[in-house]
Amino acid sequence: MLVPCRECGFYLVSFISANRGGTANLIIRPRQKVIFVIFCRGLFYFPLCKRSANAETEEFMNITPNIEKVKSLAAEYKTVPLSAKIKCAASPLEVLQKLKAISSHCYMLESCEDREKWGRFTFLGFDPKAEITCKNGCVQITDEFGVRRFNSNPRKYVLQMLAEHKSPRLDDLPAFTGGLVGYFGYDYAKYAEPKLKLDAADDAHFKDMDLMLFDKVIAFDNLNDCVFLICNMQTADVENNYAAAVSEIEIMAEVIESGKAAKVEKPRLKSDFKPLFSPEQYCEMVEKTKHYIKEGDIFQAVISNRLEAKMSGSLFETYKVLRRLNPSPYMFYFSSNDIEIAGASPETLVKLENGTLYTYPLAGTRPRGKTAEEDTRLEAELLADEKELAEHNMLVDLGRNDLGKISRFGSVEVEKYHSILKFSHVMHIGSTVRGKIRHDKTALDAIDAVLPAGTLSGAPKIRAMEIINELENNRRGIYGGAIGYIDFTGNADTCIAIRIAYKKGGRVYVRSGAGIVADSVGEKENRECINKAGAVVSALKISGGG
């Protein structure tokens, strides 16, 4: 794609370089030979002429806040989000496909509040400023300075990144204006609980954590039919950084308007799905779990099974099908060099919004009815099931305890107790737990306190995780962890990593589990696992033409 400078007529041409997979930008005159080469982390370098990149943009884009407002914020904040609102004929999915042509690192976050009503904002990002990953205590940071590795708890470096980009909450902007986006795996819990030993077999080699720092955000406002283009500028050098951020916003608009879509290979399943455990093996794990319950070790544990198949192509088409088949409160697509994730999760892990914490335990499951009458019957049956109610109550108590670790004394409350939440393939019993976060705690503390959710581990949580580690003897990876964001303002919104397909190294995985209590029946719990995996497996088969 060519981006001409309106003032001097230079063009900027971008192509993938051999230098660590980066991008080479060639600045050329029209119909002239290449005269300069620059390597940078992103697709575009700032236009050569500030006049065309800044003044003309502000003239027809209305960039906010203005430079004087930014100067007033610079004393308190290291980062300020600049934004512009534009109209856009393309859909979020069409824009995402254009972003995939620019960067292998991209994401899309959206929400469906019920089966037909989509959430107000859809967030997209590309070309991260940095990436931080961790595996078995080895932290890796990749940014403009190269690759650095440390043997450490990743918490220190995550907090440092967020502190370096502390940003104000500005009126009239979407909830997310920039921050860390990605996943915390199930095994990330060992960094919050050092005494927890998770040493199960690791055949798929997923990272414990993969977060990318996005300082540019494209936010579709589905209510007002417009798009926010957001670029976070550093306040250390306001004059130059303001001009640079304005230039980035102009480039984002150009990409959305006239960028070319990536050619995305459809997924192709090259083998049948193979379960990690046969029905007989799963039932045996259920019986062993019940033995631990009878011995008084635990009240409940969530035992999972994993489906695995060989696959070529991308999960992008799978995501498009999944959002149609299984619209959910958390819909997400995430891509990096290491992994690709498509998911539709019904359940929040933890949300922090302006000082208030939320978690929403879901437990108790029935399939959706084929008719309205059958649906109503199954709903009544679920609410009358003492085993399901006991499981749910246990997890509500666990949610209260988790939030209590980081909430102000007396602020934790339970709302909407025993509500029925319906999704495309299943229904659940749900409740809301909320609290006010302590002044000395952060969004990362909230994730540390709650992950993994009781609905994916059990109660008491630590002992249940030890038993899961023993019985499954297979690292869960992303499944049961968290997917979402921590933003530069200190807020966070994360969902439980369930109802997901994740692809790595030519293989795709789908994992699901069931809560085991004293009177669980193995065959029934195995069927529950199959039901929970149904929407994702269907999306994979349909998107590949199967």
Language model features by range: what are they?
Residues 6, 16-17, 26-41:
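Intrinsically disordered, low-complexity segments enriched in serine/proline and basic residues
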Residues 9, 21-22, 42, 481:
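Residue-identity detector for glycine
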Residues 14-17, 52:
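Serine residues within intrinsically disordered or low-complexity segments
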Residues 22, 32-33, 56:
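Charged/polar low-complexity intrinsically disordered segments
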Residues 43-60:
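Short, Lys/Arg-enriched N-terminal segments with co-localized hydrophobic residues
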Residues 61-546:
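Extended alpha-helical targeting/anchoring segments
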